[in-house]
Amino acid sequence: MKNKFPNDFFWGTATASYQIEGATDKDGKSKSIWDTFTHTPGKVKNNENGDTAVDHYHRYEEDIELMANINLNSYRFSLAWTRIIPEGIGKINPKGVDFYSRLIDKCLEKNIEPFITLYHWDLPQSLQDKGGWANRDICLLYTSPSPRDRP
Protein backbone atom coordinates (compact mmCIF):
# COMPACT_ATOMS: atom_id res chain seq x y z
CA MET A 1 0.00 0.00 0.00
CA LYS A 2 1.39 3.34 -1.03
CA ASN A 3 0.58 6.36 1.11
CA LYS A 4 0.85 9.73 -0.51
CA PHE A 5 -0.47 13.14 0.37
CA PRO A 6 -2.28 14.99 -2.42
CA ASN A 7 -0.27 17.62 -4.29
CA ASP A 8 -2.50 20.38 -2.92
CA PHE A 9 -2.03 19.34 0.72
CA PHE A 10 -1.04 22.22 3.01
CA TRP A 11 2.11 21.58 5.03
CA GLY A 12 2.44 24.42 7.45
CA THR A 13 2.74 25.88 10.86
CA ALA A 14 0.55 28.01 13.08
CA THR A 15 1.17 30.76 15.59
CA ALA A 16 -0.70 33.28 17.71
CA SER A 17 0.27 36.94 17.72
CA TYR A 18 0.83 37.30 21.48
CA GLN A 19 2.87 34.12 21.65
CA ILE A 20 5.27 35.02 18.85
CA GLU A 21 5.38 38.71 17.87
CA GLY A 22 6.82 40.48 20.90
CA ALA A 23 7.10 44.25 20.40
CA THR A 24 4.14 44.66 22.73
CA ASP A 25 4.77 48.39 23.14
CA LYS A 26 6.06 49.25 19.65
CA ASP A 27 4.59 51.22 16.77
CA GLY A 28 1.28 52.08 18.40
CA LYS A 29 0.25 48.66 19.72
CA SER A 30 -1.81 48.84 22.90
CA LYS A 31 -2.20 46.35 25.74
CA SER A 32 -4.22 43.18 25.39
CA ILE A 33 -5.66 41.12 28.21
CA TRP A 34 -2.58 38.88 27.92
CA ASP A 35 -0.23 41.81 28.50
CA THR A 36 -2.14 42.64 31.67
CA PHE A 37 -2.38 39.03 32.84
CA THR A 38 1.28 38.17 32.32
CA HIS A 39 2.42 41.33 34.09
CA THR A 40 0.32 40.54 37.17
CA PRO A 41 2.67 39.10 39.82
CA GLY A 42 2.08 35.44 40.58
CA LYS A 43 0.03 34.67 37.46
CA VAL A 44 2.78 33.17 35.28
CA LYS A 45 5.75 31.05 36.34
CA ASN A 46 9.00 33.05 36.47
CA ASN A 47 6.99 36.18 35.58
CA GLU A 48 7.46 35.37 31.90
CA ASN A 49 5.51 37.36 29.32
CA GLY A 50 5.26 38.05 25.60
CA ASP A 51 7.04 41.41 25.61
CA THR A 52 9.73 39.99 23.32
CA ALA A 53 8.58 36.40 22.71
CA VAL A 54 10.60 35.24 19.68
CA ASP A 55 10.50 38.78 18.24
CA HIS A 56 8.58 37.79 15.12
CA TYR A 57 7.59 41.45 14.72
CA HIS A 58 11.20 42.31 13.91
CA ARG A 59 12.33 38.92 12.56
CA TYR A 60 9.37 37.84 10.42
CA GLU A 61 11.45 37.84 7.21
CA GLU A 62 13.94 35.42 8.72
CA ASP A 63 11.09 33.32 10.11
CA ILE A 64 9.40 33.08 6.71
CA GLU A 65 12.74 32.14 5.11
CA LEU A 66 13.07 29.31 7.64
CA MET A 67 9.56 28.12 6.76
CA ALA A 68 10.42 28.16 3.07
CA ASN A 69 13.69 26.30 3.72
CA ILE A 70 11.78 23.38 5.24
CA ASN A 71 9.25 23.44 2.38
CA LEU A 72 6.22 24.64 4.29
CA ASN A 73 3.53 25.97 2.00
CA SER A 74 1.14 27.48 4.55
CA TYR A 75 1.26 29.66 7.63
CA ARG A 76 -1.70 30.27 9.93
CA PHE A 77 -1.20 33.33 12.11
CA SER A 78 -3.41 35.65 14.08
CA LEU A 79 -3.72 39.39 13.76
CA ALA A 80 -3.24 41.31 17.01
CA TRP A 81 -6.38 43.40 17.34
CA THR A 82 -4.35 45.74 19.56
CA ARG A 83 -1.77 46.27 16.83
CA ILE A 84 -4.34 47.15 14.13
CA ILE A 85 -6.97 49.02 16.19
CA PRO A 86 -5.16 49.92 19.42
CA GLU A 87 -8.20 51.19 21.30
CA GLY A 88 -10.31 48.25 20.18
CA ILE A 89 -12.58 50.48 18.08
CA GLY A 90 -12.04 53.59 16.03
CA LYS A 91 -8.73 54.72 14.62
CA ILE A 92 -6.75 52.20 12.59
CA ASN A 93 -3.00 52.05 13.24
CA PRO A 94 -1.24 52.26 9.85
CA LYS A 95 1.97 50.77 11.28
CA GLY A 96 0.05 47.70 12.43
CA VAL A 97 -1.61 47.28 9.03
CA ASP A 98 1.78 47.75 7.36
CA PHE A 99 3.36 45.01 9.48
CA TYR A 100 0.74 42.45 8.50
CA SER A 101 0.86 43.58 4.88
CA ARG A 102 4.63 43.01 4.79
CA LEU A 103 4.22 39.65 6.53
CA ILE A 104 1.63 38.51 3.99
CA ASP A 105 3.73 39.79 1.07
CA LYS A 106 6.76 37.86 2.35
CA CYS A 107 4.68 34.69 2.66
CA LEU A 108 3.41 35.06 -0.90
CA GLU A 109 6.92 35.80 -2.18
CA LYS A 110 8.03 32.45 -0.73
CA ASN A 111 4.94 30.58 -2.02
CA ILE A 112 3.57 30.20 1.48
CA GLU A 113 -0.21 30.51 1.67
CA PRO A 114 -1.23 32.79 4.55
CA PHE A 115 -4.23 31.74 6.64
CA ILE A 116 -5.41 34.44 9.01
CA THR A 117 -7.09 34.10 12.39
CA LEU A 118 -8.92 37.31 13.25
CA TYR A 119 -9.04 36.71 16.99
CA HIS A 120 -6.90 34.46 19.17
CA TRP A 121 -7.86 35.30 22.76
CA ASP A 122 -6.07 38.66 22.91
CA LEU A 123 -8.89 41.13 23.52
CA PRO A 124 -7.75 44.75 23.85
CA GLN A 125 -7.50 45.62 27.54
CA SER A 126 -9.52 48.78 26.85
CA LEU A 127 -12.48 46.61 25.82
CA GLN A 128 -11.99 44.24 28.75
CA ASP A 129 -12.21 47.28 31.01
CA LYS A 130 -15.71 47.83 29.57
CA GLY A 131 -16.83 44.29 30.41
CA GLY A 132 -15.08 42.27 27.72
CA TRP A 133 -17.06 39.61 25.88
CA ALA A 134 -19.75 39.72 28.59
CA ASN A 135 -20.64 43.20 27.28
CA ARG A 136 -23.11 42.77 24.42
CA ASP A 137 -21.87 45.98 22.77
CA ILE A 138 -18.38 44.52 22.39
CA CYS A 139 -19.81 41.39 20.78
CA LEU A 140 -21.70 43.61 18.34
CA LEU A 141 -18.53 45.59 17.58
CA TYR A 142 -16.72 42.40 16.63
CA THR A 143 -19.40 41.50 14.09
CA SER A 144 -19.87 45.05 12.79
CA PRO A 145 -19.78 45.47 9.01
CA SER A 146 -17.73 48.67 9.49
CA PRO A 147 -13.97 48.00 9.29
CA ARG A 148 -13.32 50.76 11.84
CA ASP A 149 -15.56 49.02 14.37
CA ARG A 150 -14.04 45.56 14.23
CA PRO A 151 -10.65 43.89 14.44
Regions found by a protein language model. Name each.
Residues 9-20, 108-121:
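Glycine-rich, aromatic-flanked loop segments that form ligand/cofactor-binding clefts
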Residues 19-21, 84-86, 123:
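Flexible loop/turn segments at secondary-structure boundaries
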Residues 64-70, 75-119:
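Aromatic-lined substrate-binding rim segments of carbohydrate-active enzymes
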Residues 119-128, 144:
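Active-site groove signature of glycoside hydrolases
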